[in-house]
Amino acid sequence: MAGLQRLASHLPVGVMLPHNTTEAPGPHSAKQDSYEQSDSSQQSLKGHLRNNFQKQLLSNKELTLDKVHTHPKWNTKARSYSYPHCTGISHQDAGSDFQGQGNGLFYSSGPQSWYPKANNQDFIPFTKKRVGVDRAYPLKPVVHRKSCSTGESGTDGDQNVYPRPPELREFSSRNFDVRNQVNFSVVDPVLAAMQAEKALANLDRMEWVQIRRLEAAGESLEEEIRRKQILLRGKLKKTEEELRRIQTQKEQAKENENRELQKIIFPRSRVKGNNSNTTHKAVFSPEFDFEEEFSRDKREDETWERSQQNSSPFQLSDYRIQRLKRERLVASNNKIRDRVSEPSMEKFSPPSETPGGALQGSARNSSLSMAPDSSGSSGSTEEPQLGECSHCGRKFLLFRLERHSNICSRMQGSKRKVFDSSRARAKGTELEQYLNWKGPASAKAEPPRKNNWRQKHESFIHTLRQAREVQQVTAKGENRSHLPPILPAENPDYIQCPHCSHHFAPKVAEQHIPKCKTIKNRPPPPRKHYS
């Protein structure tokens, strides 16, 4: 009994015993049969202990399974504990001796804290029969995912590691597969749903941001369009006002022109239709009419100065054009009135006695003779009389001759002195006595050239004859040496140099002769005396 109790105390916890004691776990050797026959009493006690131990193991398994299913966090812990212990178990060979010394660690499928370690110093004598291995139902091949060292080595270096029972292996592998299936079956749709929700949320956000941007751009465009519309309306109003002002000014200018034309036309009709009494009225009326026009122009200028502040450059240009037209009309009216009033003034004016009066009368007559062409009132076609100026000899109309003669006499009588800067600088200095205060050198009167055209003609004919003779001789094939030498042609205009007897043109001779004189008058160089 003491030996059995000792055996039970040292029995490993992780060993999976068979359920039925009658079933043989595997093939038996001859030594095992002899051992069983001799010790049958011990076998009965072993069977009783095995049954008790199996019941405890089953109860512990049920508790662990309940805890694993109730607490999902322990699933990962159990899985982490189960894998390394499964990989650390190695099977012994069938022919190996089971009674050898073994110091390995034995673990269960549960956590390590529930099962104590086996004592390394105690040795359990077993038969060669392997406990917990059913040869009729072989186990599935174990896949070693992680190699785990037991961490404790025996004294002799041999480790007898007992394998896990087949039920625990099957249960752990099935539990692992079930957990993986549950985890993947639960996690995959959840992750897919989360990813789909995130994608939809991102799309919604992007669409919302784009919509906000488009709305902001549309609002900014609407504001710009409103501003531009307001500006265009203001510009249209301004242009309409300017056009109205221009139209009113044009209408006023047309009315003024019509009034002036009427004033010009009515006096002519009065002059043509009325008698001599009306002519006297026409003679003296222009002064009053001119005063009225002058006062009216002043009033218009004042009104223009007032409106100038609020007027545009186009309006100013229109006003200037109108003013020029008005001035031209006034000038033409004055000319017409002067022409009409001159005959009547001649009737009342006394005869002039001075020669200036005669000139004025002739000038008036000439102006009257020239005027009908522009006015069209008289049809005379007399030519204008011209008078010659006694100072410059030019001809002018008689009414312009007097004015020109006065100006021309002043210009011809006054002789302006030319300012000499050298004399002004030298005045009052020692240089004044050395300067030659001569007037400007008068241009030398060149003598008239002699007309030597006959000599030139004769020399030209002589050269032509000599050239013909030479051509005839060459045509016959004779020698030219028999002909007399050709004399050089003498140009009568050329001047012969007295020093070198060469002929030069007059201007060239003037430069050549003094140079040639100095060259010829030089003394000869001294002779060299050779020793």
Swiss-Prot record:
Annotated Zn(2+) 2 binding lies at C497, C500, H512, C516
Chain sites annotated for binding Zn(2+) 1: C389, C392, H404, C408
Q: Which UniProt keywords apply?
A: Coiled coil, Metal-binding, Repeat, Zinc, Zinc-finger
User: Looking at the record, which segments are called Disordered?
Assistant: 16-45, 290-318, 334-387
* Coiled-coil annotated residue ranges, if any: 209-264
Could you confirm whether the keyword GTP-binding appears in this record? no
Q: Does the keyword Coiled coil apply?
A: yes
Q: Name one Pfam family in it.
A: zf-C2HC_2
Q: Where is the composition biased (Basic and acidic residues)?
A: 293-305, 335-345
Q: Which cofactor does it need?
A: Zn(2+)
Q: Which InterPro entries match?
A: Znf_C2HC_C3H (IPR049899), ZNF_C2HC_dom_1C (IPR026104)
Q: Where is the composition biased (Polar residues)?
A: 306-315
What top-level branch of life does the organism fall under? Answer: Eukaryota
Specify residue ranges for compositional bias: Low complexity: 35-44, 366-380
One example of the protein's molecular function in GO is: zinc ion binding
Q: Map the zinc fingers (C2HC/C3H-type) to residue ranges.
A: 385-414, 493-522
Family stated for the protein in its record: Belongs to the ZC2HC1 family.
- Under which name does UniProt file this protein? Zinc finger C2HC domain-containing protein 1C
Task: Please name the source species.
Answer: Macaca fascicularis (Crab-eating macaque)
Instruction: Please name the gene that encodes this protein.
Output: ZC2HC1C
